[in-house]
């Protein structure tokens, strides 16, 4: 059974049609990429999947349950988390504290438990701290946990964003341009990290403009153009599709 299914998703803003009849599924354990020119509807699609927007039409099913219309904190609790194109770390806090804060969506003891220092709250806080160090080690930042997050370079902040997302124990992680703004050597390191994430059992859906990265890591690719799906398949199938070459890849080849 597919982990996530999107059924004929459409989204309009006034008279603007941002998405029109987009359907796809994501299988457990795969890397599923969404590509297309600027304005193709990729970010709008992510906003629908995470509950930031509700679809004008269509349905979203995750693990067999209808998520359509849920709020972002509700989709996060169901196991869908997201990183953003512009990293959203707390730059004045430590790297470690960022990962601790990122686990708040899963805390069970609540604010009063934390204030009163109940046994359950103390036990949960210990688990949160242990998880934070575990995730920093996983992404290669264990030696930077006590640094201020804003002192990290772009690649380090990308890794931190992944650690924050993973700390909430997601089943599906949505990555918005995970290698945007970094150099080729750093891209290879992040590709290795994303493979490690996938091999740990977390399913990945990503938006990315860097085609070498997309073609290297993806199991399947969905191509959007002006809010409409124009191709779907393996990297080799998509790369050979004339509509894709004309709408997107051809632009890259020409440059």
Give residue spans per PLM region:
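Glycine-rich phosphate-binding loops of nucleotide-dependent enzymes
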Residues: 1-255
